[in-house]
């Protein structure tokens, strides 16, 4: 059901983009918008992981790294990938005091995970395993591709809306579908609608990744502790400069890296940490009654995406 919801939201976002093209240029504008959407998504499909890793200065690491904590991080990601039935991803570290992590890549065979130096320094080993299991859950669910496509289309809608606002008046009202009022409405409402859809997709995928990540690691309580520590640090700790410069990538991180974090609202990239922790605590109690299994997660594992289980 969660995958169906994501598909419907993505289809709606694409329709909004094509509709914006129609409002600006009629049938020709609609066709151009459709071609642009396909082109942008193809580019994102092949290059998004490289762009994001380069943007954050991610450095690939392996078991020969001189720091014991980094070697443990590499070993744990490799172990978690095996448990999840995934190929070994590229394992990277980003030099940032803010504790955070993300995953990227178009599919499990081309995936990469990144952890900040701040995260490796703040959390204990079980908590780091919980965080990286969450990121591998995103890889398993192909969320990295979904969110890349979503961000690309949402950004294009905003660009089209700005174009309509500044240049839409150059055409006669009779030639412009919707007229001047329609163009103004497009410029105001389209970016808001696109943002709402983008945020709804992102939040639903975070809940799902928490659930499957807890299954991969066999310890939902460790992930809950990690989220609480990261959130507490983020409220008063170092600013993620690169994320502030590129807010469109905020949804990639396990915790919203931006300084203007809010509650679990329509305009938030992530669910409220409190809600995520409560769901994980319930799941952790359930896991504890069965014992820590540490078993592999079946391919295509699915479930409800919210804190209600």
UniProtKB/Swiss-Prot annotation:
Superkingdom of the organism of origin: Bacteria
Membrane-topology descriptor: Multi-pass membrane protein
Transmembrane segments: 7-27, 28-48, 149-169, 177-197
Region ranges (Disordered): 289-309
InterPro entries: HtpX_protease, Pept_M48_protease_HtpX, Peptidase_M48
Cofactor descriptive note: Binds 1 zinc ion per subunit.
Biological-process GO terms, alphabetical: proteolysis
Predominant cellular place of this UniProt entry's protein: membrane
Gene3D superfamilies for the chain: Metalloproteases ('zincins'), catalytic domain
Cell compartment(s), UniProt: Cell inner membrane
Keyword NAD carried by entry: no
GO terms for cellular component: plasma membrane
Cofactors (names): Zn(2+)
EC number: 3.4.24.-
EC class name: hydrolase
Single GO term (MF): zinc ion binding
Protein family per UniProt: Belongs to the peptidase M48B family.
NCBIfam families assigned: PRK01345.1 (NF002363), PRK03001.1 (NF002826)
Protein name as it appears in the record: Protease HtpX homolog
Upper classification of the organism: Bacteria, Pseudomonadati, Pseudomonadota, Alphaproteobacteria, Caulobacterales
